[in-house]
Each structure stands twice: as C-alpha cells, then as structure tokens.
Amino acid sequence: MGEEIKYSRFVKTDYQQYQKRLQQETDILAEWFSNNALSKKGLVAGYELEAWLIDSNASPCPRNEAFLQRANNPYLFPELAKFNIELNVEPQSINSSLLSDFEKQLQQLWQQCKQTSKDIGCNMLGIGILPTLTNNDLSLDNISSLDRYRALNEQVLRHRQGKTIGLNINGNEHLEVERKDVMLEAAATSLQIHLQTPQDESVRYYNASMIVSAPLVAVGANAPFMFNKDLWYETRIPVFEQSVDIGGIGGAASGPMHRVTFGSHYARESLLECFNENLEHYPVLLPVTYDTEPEKLNYLRLHNGTIWRWNRPLIGFDDDGTPHLRIEHRTMSSAPSMVDNIANIAFYYGLVHYYATCIDPPEARLTFAETKDNFYRSAQLGLNHRVIWPDGNRYTIKELVLDSLLEEAQTGLDKLGISAADSQRYLGIIESRIESEQTGTQWQRKFAELNGRDMQRLTRCYYQHQQNNIPVHEWDFDCSGPHIA
C-alpha cells in the first residue's frame, strides 16, 4: 500500500480483470517456489517507523503534505492521515555494526524531521496512539490527498455494503465508537521491522516471528489510551484489526478471514501458502490496472499490501532483479525514544534468529492456537500475563524475558555477527525496561495515575522526555523540560 495508484471509479470488469491477473501472478510465484528461484542472498535488515505531527496544544497537526514538500527526502512518506508520516531506512545486509548504523541513520533522519516539522509550525512525536487524539480529528478532511487512500476508504465501505466501521474494545475500560470511513486506522502508528531471508530458510523465520510476537508486543507496548479510555496494554492491536474489518470472500465481515490478522496457521511447506490464501480467501480491494509484465508481480504485491498480517510475508526484488522474500514484523508501537526503537529491533532480530535456527523447531512444540492466544493475551494484559512456551511451561512475559529470552536474543545476535558492544547495549535497555516494568504503556498509565486523566499534559510531558533520547525506563514524571513550541 506504499505505492500511489491511478484511480477514478472501479467497475465490475475491473475486479474480474484484476482477479485474472492475480491468479496468473500467483501461478508465476508458485513456479518460482517450485524451482527454488527466489533469492538465496543472506539476511537483509530494514525497518519503517510511523510518527505523528502535533501542534503546540499536543493535538494532531494535519500538514504532512507541506512537511514532505519541505523535507524533500526520499526516505519520508505520507500515511493515511495528514498528521502521520513514515520514516524509512536503506536496507542493509546484517553485519557487526548494523544496530549502531541503524541508530545513527534514524537519529539523523529524526533530527531532520524535527526541524522540518518546526519549519511548518508542527512538532514530531513517536508514539503508538496519540493520547490527545479525538474522534473529530479522524474526519475525512484529514485524509492524505493521495488517490490510494481515497480508493481504500471507498472500497472498504463498498465491501461493508455501507455499514459503519466500529470499535468495540473491552480492556481496563470499554470503548465503543462508530465511523463511516476508515480513518480509525490512522490512530495506530507502529515500528515495522523487515527481514529478508533466503527461500529455504523463510518458513522457519516466519514461524519464529509468530512465536516471538507475544513477548515482543508486550515489551514494545506504547499505546494504552484511545479517546481518553484505558484499554489494552497495546491498544493498537484491536484498533487496527477493527478499523478495516471487511472479512473475506463473500463479504463475511464477521467470518474467519479478517483483513488485519495474526494469520490462520504456521507456514508448513513454504510462504506460498500465504499468497494462495490471499488469492482464495480475500476479495480484491483495489482493482487498479498496471502496464507491466506479470513477472513484476504488481497485482499480487498490491493485493498482499491490503492484507495486514501482524507478520506479513512480502515479495520484493534484489538489485539484480532476483525476486526475494521478506518478513515484515508489525506488532510493536512506535517507541518513546529512538534508542528504544533500536533496542526493540535488536530484540526481534536476536530472538527470531535464535528460534529460526535452533535444532528443535519451536513450532513443533507449540501449537498455532497457543501462539495466537499468547499474542492476543499479551497485547491485552502485558508483562505479568502468563503465556505457554515451547518447553510446555507457563511464564509471565516478565519472567520469560528476564530468565531466558534476553540470553537467547544475545545468542541470536552473536550468531548474526552483531558486535558484542551493540548487542549488550541494546539488550541492556530491554532488560532494564522489563526489570523496572516501565514500558511506554506503563509510563503513560503511571503518569495518568499521578496527574489525572489529562491527555494534553501527558502528551506534553512525553514529548519533553522524547527530546532527550533516553530510554523510557529512565523517564521520570517531571515535566520541566522543553515545551512544545
């Protein structure tokens, strides 16, 4: 969904033609899998970070078009709402300095974004859900002025046959709201970690990504509040799942195949299973026309981009044109500081490599149903919720991280060749965060407990701390720092 489209109005024949081409491209991909023709290149890392533009009142600042024009940076992109943007980095092969390189690149890009946002009368903020966000902020007046977003909105409503889109979230409190557009999706901003894998290793990495999603969603949580309600430990999860809920083939909006999903099973033989599932169970959402040869897989890739698995397989191409597989891990919020984002990335890469390469595959010892339940319960309940692990025992997320996962992540990073200094630094941040139980979510909840449910004050204090780029476990509740301009 990151690519602009040409759009006017879709008619029945557009869907028929798109479906035909989607079948053709899925067949081509199946042939590539069968012939082992996908890239055998070593692991390649990358990530995307979604962020907010806010004004001097800590409310959304819907000026991403002016921001992007002024920044003139190919690594910055618009998002669904005019007050959101996305930061990208250049993917790179995993090497000893990967993590520190990522941090330097992110710091440089973030500094440019901060200055550019000030130049247009806004400020930059990284957070999972903006606490000051209101339902009125999510009006269609604030949808980004790109055809793909207008088309997405119209097509989601078309598939819902005009029925409103609603949130019904039970957490510490209850939130129920309905809208006639897809703008609820813009409430949730995330860190999306990419890992390109060789074809013959992709099943293990994909399944490992699913298994480690439960601890990662809790460790990286930074979104407890939505519309002044304290909901899940990571409220992004139900918000995003419900905001584009149109179901699968036949319009079964309450059926088993949701557009935003944890998935329906582990990968068994290959990641082709996900693309076959896309073809068979998900109706075409954006039936645009491309003037490209089928081997570019434009139709397949766009269709896959309108299905938001929390661990999403992607097809791309190496510089020499060889098709490759990537896994996009989408469970974690945009973090309280840039160094927290890199620590989260380190924890993911270390854990996923450890579990993808261990001799005894963990997916053979933990059912998919257990893995899925672990994920949703962790997203709702956080660090002190118990999950079942492949060894057959139950642990709280806190126990699991401190007693085994940090050591396993360290082993994984060592095997990847990450420098000891970097792995110790970033995993040390995770360790301190979990020992103190001060995740982004917990800091926000504690602030509200100490100061009342004043979302503007909370956001101002959060913004002040974010300017210092110190990890969230070191944050206090003193708001005497630099104010939002």
Q: For the regions a protein language model found, what residue spans apply to each?
A:
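Phosphate/nucleotide-binding catalytic core
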Residues: 1-485
